[in-house]
Structures are given as structure tokens and as C-alpha cells.
């Protein structure tokens, strides 16, 4: 029983009017038994496992305070970016373990993980974080070294004679 559609209004009224995945009901938070949201963030070679829960804004990285682990203010600002974008500064405690890569990659992985964990804890924050580009994994990684070259793109020094 195929229904003929003559206008866009008929298309809206059809049986499949609402696209899949776009339901009007709010999403439910993904929490563990202890009431924490868990997410994994990645950047370059670094991987961050992040747990967030409501608290006073304390961030623990590998058992150390944020200011001790990330001494550079730029990295600390980068890590706190998801909270400032959604106006949740000092409302969540973060406990995370970071491994691999350098400090900059680890800070990027931590920012990615915090953003994902925030969306799991409060799904309503997803559009703001997505618009800021914090939920997208940065695909840039180190280019591999090629044979016949000194590095990925640099050639060996040329000697005319």
C-alpha cells in the first residue's frame, strides 16, 4: 500500500515523519555505580581516562593536582575550557589517568575526555560542546618517516661533488 506524496506537507505527515535518533525525550545520563561519568579522550599518542562527579572543581591527574602535573598556564586553561564553555566551572571534580605522548598531547586528551564525560553526565550540554569543537577527536598525528629520507619529509643533505 504505497502512499503517493504530492507535496512537502504530505511528506511531513507521513509515517516516518520523525528521523531516527532525533527523539523529543531527553537523553538519560550514563553514570556508574558511584554516580560518576566515565569517558576516554585521545590526542596524538596520549590517552586520558576521565571520571567526573559533582564537587568543588578539584582536578586530579595521575594522583597529582592539576597545577603540579601541568605547570604551564596554557595547558591548564586548555583543560578547563570545557567547563568554561558550558558555565560549569568549579562544579565537577575530575579524576583522571593520562598516559602516552607529551604534556601538550596529554592536555588535549584530557580536554577531549572531560568534554565527553560532561556530555555523558549532562546530555543537554552536548550541543554547546559540539559547537565549540571539543567533542571531535583531533586526527592530526605525527607523520611517519619514509625510507630514503632523513625524516618524514626532509631529504638528506645534497652534495654536488
Curated annotation (Swiss-Prot):
GO molecular function, one term: RNA binding
Region described as Disordered: 1-38
Basic and acidic residues biased stretches: 27-38
SUPFAM superfamilies documented for this protein: Ribosomal protein S5 domain 2-like
GO cellular component: cytosolic small ribosomal subunit
Example GO biological process: translation
Keyword terms, alphabetized: Ribonucleoprotein, Ribosomal protein
The keyword Methyltransferase is annotated on this UniProt entry: no
Family: Belongs to the universal ribosomal protein uS9 family.
The name this protein goes by in its record: Small ribosomal subunit protein uS9
Name of the gene this protein is made from: rpsI
Amino acid at each position: 500500500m504505497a502512499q503517493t506524496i504530492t507535496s512537502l506537507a504530505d511528506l511531513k505527515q507521513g509515517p516516518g515523519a520523525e528521523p531516527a535518533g532525533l527523539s523529543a525525550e531527553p537523553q538519560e545520563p550514563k553514570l556508574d555505580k558511584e554516580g560518576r561519568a566515565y569517558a576516554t579522550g585521545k590526542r596524538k599518542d596520549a590517552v586520558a581516562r576521565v571520571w567526573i562527579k559533582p564537587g568543588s572543581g578539584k582536578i586530579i591527574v595521575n594522583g597529582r593536582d592539576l597545577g603540579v602535573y601541568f605547570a604551564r598556564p596554557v595547558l591548564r586553561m586548555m583543560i578547563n575550557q570545557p567547563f568554561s564553555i558550558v558555565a560549569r566551572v568549579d562544579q565537577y571534580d575530575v579524576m583522571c589517568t593520562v598516559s602516552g605522548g607529551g604534556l601538550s598531547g596529554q592536555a588535549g586528551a584530557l580536554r577531549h575526555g572531560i568534554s565527553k564525560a560532561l556530555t555523558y553526565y549532562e546530555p543537554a550540554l552536548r550541543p554547546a560542546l559540539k559547537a565549540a569543537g571539543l567533542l571531535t577527536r583531533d586526527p592530526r598525528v605525527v607523520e611517519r618517516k619514509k625510507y630514503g629520507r632523513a625524516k618524514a619529509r626532509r631529504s638528506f643533505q645534497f652534495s654536488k661533488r
